Amino acid sequence: MKKIYFAGSIRGGRDDKDLYAEIIEKLKKYGEVLTEHLGDKTLSVMGEYVKKSDFIYNRDIEWLKTADIVISEVTNPSLGVGYELAYAEKLNIPVVCLYRPSADKKLSAMIEGNKNFNVFEYQKVQDLDEFFIKIFN
């Protein structure tokens, strides 16, 4: 069973929390989602209230180190997600970036221009079904 690290914005904005929950449910068909809490609709932009930042950092780095693949939703820019992607790249962990193009949300050149990242553009969560079958099988 694959260990999947899902990355998405928390403190950078929770506008996509419902989408994250749907993506995480789809990913669970292919393995253990280490960061399943990102789909928690009660998680606010303040993050995990009871946990200190250093605890969250250390825990997430440990999860990253054990991951077989990183799947990230990068439409909503996030410093934390960018850091996680760079860390995963340094560890030679495959990175997939899911992105919904729109007139007001442009993908960072640091993501789009990185040949080590697999960027997949989509519009609806249903568009991910075939893509996930392809990358996990």
Task: For every predicted segment, state its role.
Residues 1-137:
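Conserved catalytic or regulatory cores that recognize and/or transform ribose-phosphate-containing ligands
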